[in-house]
UniProtKB/Swiss-Prot annotation:
Organism: Mycobacterium tuberculosis (strain ATCC 25618 / H37Rv)
Family membership noted in the UniProt record: In the N-terminal section; belongs to the CN hydrolase family. Apolipoprotein N-acyltransferase subfamily.
Alphabetical keyword list: Acyltransferase, Cell membrane, Glycosyltransferase, Hydrolase, Membrane, Transferase, Transmembrane, Transmembrane helix
The name this protein goes by in its record: Bifunctional apolipoprotein N-acyltransferase/polyprenol monophosphomannose synthase
Lineage of the organism: Bacteria, Bacillati, Actinomycetota, Actinomycetes, Mycobacteriales
EC number(s) given by UniProt: 2.3.1.269, 2.4.1.-, 2.4.1.83
Domain notes for this protein: Consists of 2 domains; the N-terminus (residues 1-593) probably has the N-acyltransferase activity while the C-terminus (residues 594-874) has polyprenol monophosphomannose (PPM) synthase activity. The whole protein has higher PPM synthase than the second domain alone when expressed in M.smegmatis, suggesting the N-acyltransferase domain plays a stimulating role in PPM synthesis.
């Protein structure tokens, strides 16, 4: 009966939770479809605003957790990219199409996680927009050089916000669209809250910020629009030239395009001859130069004389230079392993080849195969990838004396390619493209990207495709003339040669980095506000009833120290508030207790450490061991020494035995049969020392980098109450000597990465000079430690803090070894990157679960927060 009553009581809550989750799932799917609708062939620019508004609604919902934000963002991205990229699957099947869509969807997933973390900050629509721009930047560089296809800005070629791209490039346009969408959501949520309270009083003040943001975006677009609108008319002093585009077409679409090479070349020659005939008949204008598409001559004209003769005949017939697309062998490569460049080369009538541009951003899986040892086993199409290598240069060729920028095919989607051409002096942009392996949808989307570039850089853009769509685009983004898809045709049009540099051309990368930096900064601020970074806590003086043998601030009977009211900030929910991050600051069940700087003097009643064991792992340290042993026994005569030797081939183990014989009872040696890493050596030493009732166990390197003369600082800190005393290079008073700058940068980067990932306020978490109380080591599951290298130090520190023990950093002087060779390797770095990330995620998820179980610490969202301090007991 009791079970039945409990189930009946839970049913309404369960139904509500399921209904709420299903609603968010459906809204995420609809949002992904709407974002797709903003791109060609739909061209519903407004759908992007609605899509991001709906996604913002999902991510600001109080029931959406950080993991939920990741999931909803991933679902949104998957629906969007699966809908946007089906043209990939038409020729290679669903596998590569879905794999690419899934990879791209990871980035909106990252945005979803970011958004849930920062949503409680004042002005969250701004941070959402900044975060969206940052994830688009990340997708433009990762993986394998990035894939910017699908950036929100590229769906705005027909929209009223397009002028923003001239101010700050694609990044600013995407940010503006996201800001409008998120601002509308914020306004709607505040109006809803105001309405639910009966509409009493004035309009909600929280709508002012998002409304102002929307107005600012629209105002910026309106200010720039007149200049964009009249860009095609020129200033009156700009020269004009006539440009012709030849679209020769291919016999059939598909991946066997290369088998049609001669037919494709002949098609472009014949279409150029038709253009020449029309010029001579007065039906077309005489062009100053002609643009052929990418791969219009996939027969190298320098190797095949017949191909060169055909191109020369076309150039002489039209009486103008032709920019042809071809491939060229990389000199010096063996015949069985050739490489090529994807080249656009100027072919002058009478004199032949002249200036050239080698494609600088080659396409993975199409023009080259990354990680062939893996992908050859995953797809039968992998071996059809080319062997192209990237070129270099300014991205500018001179045709008939005109500097023309070349962005070959998919280079147009990367900000850096057209910008490099313009900064290199290009007065006109051209996009030679080969879309014979895809379909009309892909060509329409690429054409939209070219329109955005025309406005961004205030240049005419000439698009030439083997199968279409070819077009001439004005600087206002409008099409002057275009061809249909999959038909032979030519275009001729007058264009103006422009030299003005737009703000986006000049400062676009700077704005991009500002947005990325702002996103990184705001997420750190949000993580701190959400309680992810513990604050340094100082020990409290012991009361007269405290156990005299317990460290300060801690009773052996009561466990970890209680925290005062000022230690944590708890955010109280507003009445009627919709949002909750699930990240309110709370008291974790295990607590760390940390201090930094000079060690405190021993508290009254604390007995100094009596039995201290210094563990020194060795491998090929024969030159260093006698020196460090002598310095240690002179500096701290009372400590015992354990040398753990990993079968050093240089005789270090035998030398250690001699030192032990000369110092009986104080120096000991452990011989291990194999070199299993630094971590395994220390674990063996810990087990040896714990079994012999040592009260303090110290880690020390044999190479002299850890000064034995400074060991007393660590022991004083332990006697003062620390469970783990770390000899720190990076707290006040700590220094590093004779270290190569690369190692110093690596060390500081590793510490910063670990500190941020784990949320631990320890400055030198990778330090290897440290002293442990035996109680701390006994509480740690040492059998579960499998880390090696310096990751071992991070692992033990993380376990010590997670178990609620006191960690203290004391300053030391670290000196680089003078003798022997460092054991640092790339595998140590890879291990740390992976494991620290995993520990950080696991720790934050456990904190998140704890916070969600505590509704009294939930935090409100869009309209700001009221902060109060309170102590929470478990």
């Amino acid at each position: 009966m009791k079970l039945g009553a409990w189930v009946a009581a839970q049913l309404p809550t369960t139904r509500t939770a399921v209904r709420t989750r299903l609603t968010r799932l459906v809204v995420s799917i609809v949002a992904g479809l709407l974002l797709y609708a903003s791109f060609p062939p739909r061209n519903c620019w407004w759908a992007a605003v609605v899509a991001l508004a709906l996604l913002a609604w999902v991510l600001t919902h109080r029931a959406t957790t950080p993991v939920g934000g990741l999931g909803y963002g991933l679902l949104f991205g998957l629906v969007f990219y699966v809908s946007l990229l089906p043209w990939i699957g038409e020729l290679v099947g669903p596998g590569p199409w879905l794999a690419l869509a899934t990879t791209c969807a990871l980035f909106p997933g990252i945005f979803g996680l970011f958004a849930v973390v920062v949503r409680l900050l004042p002005g969250w629509p701004i941070w959402f927009a900044v975060g969206w721009a940052a994830q688009e930047w990340l997708k433009s560089i990762l993986p394998f050089g990035g894939f910017p296809w699908g950036s929100v800005a590229f769906g705005q070629a027909e929209g009223p916000l397009l002028p923003l791209v001239q101010l700050g490039g694609v990044a600013l346009l995407s940010t503006g669209v996201a800001l409008v969408g998120c601002g509308l959501t914020a306004i709607a949520l505040e109006i809803e809250k105001w309405w639910r309270t009966g509409g009493q009083g004035d309009a909600p003040p929280a709508v002012v910020l998002p409304a102002a943001c929307i107005c600012l975006v629209l105002f910026a677009a309106i200010v720039v629009w007149p200049q964009v609108r009249h860009a095609g008319s020129g200033s009156g002093g700009e020269p004009t030239v006539t440009v012709a585009v030849v679209q020769g077409n291919v016999p059939r679409l598909g991946l066997d395009f290369n088998a049609q090479r001669r037919a494709v070349l002949d098609n472009h020659v014949e279409e150029t001859l038709r253009l020449a005939a029309d010029v001579h008949a007065g039906l077309a204008q005489q062009p100053q130069f002609v643009i052929w598409p990418e791969n219009s001559s996939d027969i190298d004209p320098f190797v095949n004389p017949d191909a060169g003769q055909r191109i020369s005949a076309a150039a002489e017939a039209i009486g103008a230079p032709i920019l042809i697309g071809t491939l060229m062998d990389v000199p010096g490569r063996p015949r069985e392993n050739p490489e090529w460049t994807n080249t656009a080369i100027v072919w002058n009538p009478g004199t032949g080849p002249a200036d050239r541009h080698d494609k600088a951003i080659v396409q993975p899986f199409g023009e080259y195969l990354p990680m062939p040892w893996l992908f050859r086993h995953l797809s039968g199409y992998a071996d059809r990838a080319g062997h192209f290598v990237p070129g270099n240069g300014t991205g500018v060729v001179r045709i008939a004396g005109v500097p023309v920028g070349v962005a070959t095919c998919w280079e147009v989607i990367f900000d850096r390619a057209p910008r490099k051409s313009i900064l290199g002096g290009a007065q006109l942009l051209t996009v030679p493209s080969n879309n014979a392996t895809f379909n009309k949808t892909m060509s329409e989307q690429q054409l939209a990207f070219a329109k955005v570039r025309a406005v961004e850089h205030d240049r005419y853009v000439v698009v030439a495709g083997t199968t279409g769509i070819s077009a001439v685009i004005a600087p206002d983004g409008g099409e002057l003339i275009r061809t249909d898809f999959f038909q032979p045709a030519y275009l001729d049009s007058q264009v103006r040669l422009k030299t003005r540099l737009t703000p986006a051309t000049r400062w676009g990368p700077i704005l991009q980095w500002i947005l990325v930096g702002a996103a990184a900064a705001v997420v750190l601020v949000a993580m701190r506000q959400n309680g992810w970074f513990p604050r340094p806590r100082r020990s409290e003086p012991k009361g007269e009833n405290d156990d005299s043998d317990a460290p300060p601030g801690r009773s052996e009977a009561s466990g970890p120290p209680a925290l005062s009211e000022s230690d944590d900030e708890l955010i109280q929910p507003e009445q009627g508030g919709r949002h909750s991050s699930g990240f309110g600051r709370h008291r974790a069940t295990s607590r760390s207790y940390m201090t930094t700087g000079q060690p405190a003097p021993p508290a009254p009643g604390n007995r100094p450490s009596q039995r201290v064991l210094v563990i020194i792992p060795t491998f090929n340290e024969r030159e260093n061991l006698p020196v460090i042993h002598r310095r240690l026994t002179q500096a701290c005569p009372a400590v015992h020494v354990l040398v753990v030797d990993d079968s050093s081939p240089d005789g270090t183990g035998q030398l250690a035995d001699e030192l032990a014989q000369a110092d009986p009872g104080r120096t000991h040696v452990m011989h291990r049969t194999a070199k299993n890493g630094l971590g395994a050596a220390y674990l063996a030493g810990f087990a040896w020392g714990l079994s012999r009732e040592y009260s303090v166990l110290v880690e020390m390197d044999a190479d002299g980098s850890h000064a034995p003369e400074q060991l007393q600082r660590l022991l004083d800190a332990v006697d003062a109450g620390a469970d783990l005393a770390i000899g720190s290079r990076y707290v006040a008073g700590g220094t590093v000597r004779n270290w190569p700058w690369r190692r110093l940068v690596l060390s500081k980067t590793a510490n910063t990465y670990s500190r941020l990932a784990l949320g631990i306020g320890i400055h030198d978490i990778t330090a290897g000079y440290r002293a442990y109380r035996r109680e701390a080591l006994e509480a740690i599951d040492l059998d579960g430690v499998d880390s090696k290298g310096y990751c071992f130090q991070i692992d033990l520190t993380w376990r010590t803090v997670s178990n609620g023990f006191v960690v203290t950093e004391v300053p030391i002087t670290f000196t680089e070894r003078e003798l022997g060779v460092s054991k640092m390797s790339g595998s140590n770095i890879r291990e740390a990157l992976v494991k620290v990330a995993r520990w950080g995620i696991e720790g934050r998820l456990s904190r998140s679960d704890h916070a969600r179980a505590r509704p009294d610490i939930a935090r409100p969202g869009a309209g700001g927060s009221r902060v109060s301090r309170a102590d929470v007991t478990e």
